[in-house]
UniProtKB/Swiss-Prot annotation:
Keyword Nucleotidyltransferase: yes
Annotated region (Adenylyl transferase), positions in chain: 450-947
UniProt name for this protein: Bifunctional glutamine synthetase adenylyltransferase/adenylyl-removing enzyme
InterPro entries (UniProt xref): GlnE, GlnE_rpt_dom, NT_sf, PII_UdlTrfase/GS_AdlTrfase
GO molecular function per UniProt: [glutamate-ammonia-ligase] adenylyltransferase activity; [glutamine synthetase]-adenylyl-L-tyrosine phosphorylase activity; ATP binding; magnesium ion binding
Native source species: Salmonella paratyphi B (strain ATCC BAA-1250 / SPB7)
One Pfam family recorded for the sequence: GlnD_UR_UTase
Record function comment: Involved in the regulation of glutamine synthetase GlnA, a key enzyme in the process to assimilate ammonia. When cellular nitrogen levels are high, the C-terminal adenylyl transferase (AT) inactivates GlnA by covalent transfer of an adenylyl group from ATP to specific tyrosine residue of GlnA, thus reducing its activity. Conversely, when nitrogen levels are low, the N-terminal adenylyl removase (AR) activates GlnA by removing the adenylyl group by phosphorolysis, increasing its activity.
Alphabetical GO biological process terms: regulation of glutamine family amino acid metabolic process
Record's catalysed reaction(s): [glutamine synthetase]-O(4)-(5'-adenylyl)-L-tyrosine + phosphate = [glutamine synthetase]-L-tyrosine + ADP; [glutamine synthetase]-L-tyrosine + ATP = [glutamine synthetase]-O(4)-(5'-adenylyl)-L-tyrosine + diphosphate
HAMAP family to which the protein is assigned, alphabetical: GlnE
Top-level lineage group: Bacteria
């Protein structure tokens, strides 16, 4: 055993002062002294439980003692009689065994591979022990779940990630997926439940038993987001549902996750074999799967972006050359060749590395270096986490913990440890880059082209100076360019830029100036780019990105030249520069039906319990997607209606994620309303009005939302902090509004307007579906019925969605007096014009003026309310373009007029989109769009003025 270093020997005196009575310095062994000095977690634990220290001193932990965990836990749970005592015993057991593992690890009594094995077996033992106890308790309450043949059905648990691979770290959370075999009902209980309900309740109780913090702490943080559909999917799925999902919708990243999936507990029964056989074809393809390479390249980019996004310079997991990259290297070979090479199908990393060497897929020396680096990094990670039982992979900044880690890693001091760490991570990074490296480099021709611009940048020319490379520009443009460069250099003098930043900037600027100044609009483009550069000069990683990836620089210049809005967004949120790396995705927005899945994958990288990071991630995802939509718009690959479709689908994905987060937070605090025990879903819906409801969102549109629930009176929640069910839904809606509007470093998510709810701002924020129906039937004004034309459910379970659709259809198909309706709609439009009228008399306001977008919307709404009682099909759609189609198809409006209004409408909306990209207000010269305006005005007179 290595003697304590000088700093730790000094710290030992602080430890002595904390020891309880009966513990004397002389009574403790050198081993105990070392462990208690190294780990505050171990010290706190033995202070609370002195008998554990006596146990450790008399019999040191053994390498194979994990074989006894199940028996020890069974003894501990023998006297458990309820959920509360179960939770207490689980926490007590976990802490006791973790102290033993920390002892063995700190003193190197067992090797590092065995430590990983012990940590994984401990988690599996606790998961299975809790599941089995709770399964029996649930069967006593509701009966045993059986298939139609009466065969009892078990809950199977897939351990994912490091748990599945037997490589869990000291303070890891656990990723799980729950499944059960076949549908059926419970038998022999006080009341019958279908199997889905039984296993959902069992799953909820199991998560609570493991995850919920109590005075004794928690067992493990449980993350269920890897299950099909993530947080929005069922908590537990049948085998059939799992098979359907992975066959029809399984994504590449879910294949990567499933490589390590392992069934927890005794898993050689028929059900377990069936589940494994079902999943294997999804993970390992029978052929050599080179199609995965591009997906893996994308993953590499995601890793790099995460490192930049979170500033992970000292992170041994996610930083360059860290644990994640070793895992990635191994998965490359598993996913490409695993279907043909069974030896690559191991869930654990080290055996798979051996197989890679045996198959000669990597040089022996590379494999040897990866193995040594992996064990070094995993030991360092576990020691770091065992100091405070804290889930971290970031190297400490304080001297005490640095001294602890240096001693634990058998280094003389911290600099020596950092040197060893740097060497290991450099070896990993080299293999990682060689495997799928695609970095771009300058050609000699590019270097030659940029040389004259190096002089322009470094010589600090004055605006009246002449230089041949700017001779092609007009005099005024040349002066502006030189002034912009000079002003930018002055701005740099005010910034704390280090030597590395200066060096990268001096490499970047000649290339940037060469590209910008070859354009006719050089001065305008440079004026948009220099504020962005000024914002990132102290963040060298972003300068390096633009310097090392010429393609990204070219896209930056093109987009900033085309749109000041994009330039402003990039300057405000430099994280978006990562999106410029891949033109394949930059100009091809996410498929409209894939936003939810993309967002779910993005959020998986953020701890579920870290609300601040979750809020940031939502905003960053939205901004990245907005950039891609705008880039495609500028490139002409998205017509106006498709732009709005993408913006709308993106907003719906955001609403879905925000509701999921708010729901999770509320249920953790209060439980869920008890009426949900008898039905599927959450009894909650979000209705989108206006541009969201009509699939017509613009780049800066806010969201018009109302919230509905179906909670009966006198229902309470079922959590420890019980509240009224309707109060729960009110707080849920308030939480949703908060998550949307909270300003983080990445701004707000959306402005949300909930004033279209019954009784407007004076009404309740969330309304019962029955009260909403009654209000619409008896109290709503005509303008509220107009608004209902453009309303639809954007989040909600099928039951509430159906209720809302019925109310909407009933209101819209109510027979109305044509003359009265005409007058009310016309007067409302006149009020709007008076209130929101154009302040620029010499300009045409595209939305608000006569002949503009709002007039077309009012015509469509009027005709639906006027004729839907005769033609109920008019209620089908909520967007203006398809409403105009329906009016023509149902003989209300002449087909030529409907088509002309549609063209006018899309033309005007297209102009609004483009004005937004230019950061210009929504008005143009009076001479613009005269043909479209005349056509709209004629239709207005025909339908809303003529008798």
């Amino acid at each position: 055993m290595t003697p304590l270093s000088s700093p730790l020997s000094q710290y030992w005196q602080t430890v002595v002062e904390r020891l309880p009575e009966g513990f004397t310095e002389t009574s403790l062994s050198a081993q105990a002294k070392s462990v208690l000095t190294f780990s505050d977690f171990a010290l706190d634990s033995v202070i609370a439980h002195p008998e554990w220290l006596a146990e450790l001193e008399s019999a040191s932990p053994q390498a194979d003692e994990w074989r006894h965990y199940a028996g020890w836990l069974q003894e501990a749970l023998a006297g458990v009689c309820d959920d509360a005592s179960l939770m207490r015993e689980l926490r007590f057991f976990r802490r006791r065994i973790m102290v033993r593992i920390a002892w063995a690890q700190t003193l190197s009594l067992v090797d590092d591979e065995t430590i990983l094995q012990q940590l994984s077996h401990l988690a599996e033992t606790l998961i299975v022990g809790a599941r089995d106890w709770l399964y029996a308790a649930c069967c006593r309450e509701w009966g045993t779940p059986c298939n139609p043949q009466g065969v009892p059905q078990p809950l199977l648990i897939l351990g994912m990630g490091k748990l599945g691979g037997g490589e869990l770290n000291f303070s890891s959370d656990i990723d799980l997926i729950f499944a059960w075999p076949e549908h059926g009902e419970t038998r022999g209980g006080r009341r019958e439940l279908d199997n889905a309900q039984f296993f959902t309740r069992l799953g909820q109780r199991l998560i609570k038993a493991l995850d919920q913090p109590t005075m004794d702490g928690f067992v493990y943080r449980v993350d269920m987001r890897l299950r099909p559909f993530g947080d929005s999917g069922p908590l537990v799925l049948s085998f059939a549902a799992l098979e359907d999902y992975y066959q029809e919708q399984g994504r590449d990243w879910e294949r990567y996750a499933m490589v390590k999936a392992r069934l927890m507990g005794d898993n050689d029964d028929a059900w377990s074999r069936e589940l494994r056989a079902m999943l294997r074809p999804f993970v390992f393809r029978r052929y050599i799967d080179f199609s995965v390479i591009q997906s893996l390249r994308n993953m590499k980019g995601m890793i790099a972006r995460e490192v930049r996004r979170r500033g992970l310079k000292d992170n041994i997991k996610l930083g360059a050359g860290g644990i994640r990259e070793i895992e990635f290297i191994v998965q490359v070979f598993q996913l490409i060749r695993g279907g043909r090479e069974p030896s690559l199908q191991s869930r654990s990393l080290l055996p798979t590395l051996d197989a890679i060497a045996a198959l000669h897929l990597l040089p022996e020396n590379d494999v040897a270096q990866l193995r040594v680096a992996y064990l070094f990094l995993r030991r360092l990670e576990n020691l770091l986490q065992s100091i405070n039982d804290e889930q971290t992979q970031t190297l400490p900044a304080d001297d005490l913990n640095r001294a602890r880690l240096a001693w634990g890693m058998k280094a003389e001091n911290w600099p020596q440890l950092v040197g060893e760490l740097t060497d290991h991570m450099a070896n990993v990074r080299r293999v990682f880059n060689e495997l799928i490296g695609d970095d771009e480099a300058d050609t000699p021709q590019e270097e030659e082209r940029s040389e004259p611009w190096r002089e322009v940048w470094q010589d600090a020319l004055q605006e009246d100076d002449s230089t041949p490379v700017l001779a092609h520009l007009a005099d005024e443009d040349r002066r502006q360019v030189l002034t912009l460069i000079a002003d930018f250099r002055k701005e740099l003098d005010k910034r704390p830029i280090g030597p590395r930043g200066r060096q990268v900037l001096d490499q970047l600027m000649p290339h940037l100036l060469a590209d910008v100044c070859s354009r006719e609009d050089a001065a305008v483009t440079l004026s948009r780019i220099t504020p962005l550069l000024a914002g990132i000069v102290t963040r060298t990683t972003y300068l390096e990105l633009l310097s090392e990836f010429p393609g990204a620089l070219k896209h930056l210049i093109m987009l900033c030249a085309a749109s000041p809005m994009i330039a402003s967004q990039l300057a405000r949120y430099p994280l978006l520069l990562d999106e410029l790396l891949d033109p394949g995705t930059l100009y091809q927005p996410t498929a409209t039906d894939a936003y939810r899945d993309e967002l779910r994958q993005y959020l998986l990288r953020v701890p579920e319990e870290d609300e601040e990071q979750q809020l940031e991630a939502l905003r960053q995802f939205k901004q990245a997607q907005l950039l891609r939509i705008a880039a495609a718009d500028i490139a002409g690959t998205l017509p106006v209606m498709k732009v709005s479709d993408h913006l709308t689908w993106l907003a719906e994905a955001m609403i879905d994620a925000v509701v999921q987060q708010a729901w999770t937070q509320m249920v953790a605090r209060y439980g869920q309303p008890a009426h949900l025990d008898e039905r599927q879903g959450r009894g909650f819906a979000v209705v989108g009005y206006g541009k969201l409801g009509g699939w017509e969102l613009g780049y800066s549109s806010d969201l018009d939302l109302i919230f509905l629930h179906d909670c009966p009176m006198d229902v309470m929640t079922n959590g420890e902090r019980e509240i009224d069910g309707r109060q729960f839904y009110l707080r849920l809606a308030q939480r949703i509004m908060h998550l949307f509007s909270t300003r983080t470093s990445s701004g707000i998510l959306y402005e949300v307007d909930a004033r279209l709810r019954p009784s407007g701002a004076a009404g309740m924020l969330v309304t019962s579906a029955d009260a909403f129906a009654d209000y619409q039937q008896h109290e709503a004004w005509t303008w509220e019925h107009q608004a209902l034309v453009r309303a639809r459910v954007v989040y909600g379970d099928p039951q509430l969605t159906s209720q809302f659709d019925t109310v909407r259809r009933t209101i819209m198909t109510t027979a109305r007096d044509g003359k009265t309706l005409q007058t009310e709609v016309r007067e409302m439009r006149e009020k709007m014009r008076a209130h929101l009228g154009n302040k620029h008399r010499d300009r045409f306001d595209i939305k608000a003026d006569e002949g503009g977008i709002t007039d077309i919307e009012f015509i469509a709404q009027y005709l639906v309310l006027r004729y839907a009682h005769e033609k109920p099909k008019l209620t089908r759609w909520s967007d203006n373009v398809r409403i105009l189609e329906l009016l023509a198809q149902n003989g209300i409006m002449d087909e030529h007029e409907a088509q002309a209004l549609t063209v006018a409408y899309t033309t005007l909306r297209d102009e609004l989109h483009h004005l937004a990209l230019q950061e210009l207000p929504g008005h143009v010269a009076q001479t613009c769009f005269s043909k479209e305006r005349a056509l709209v005005q004629a239709s207005w007179r025909k339908w809303l003025v003529a008798v």
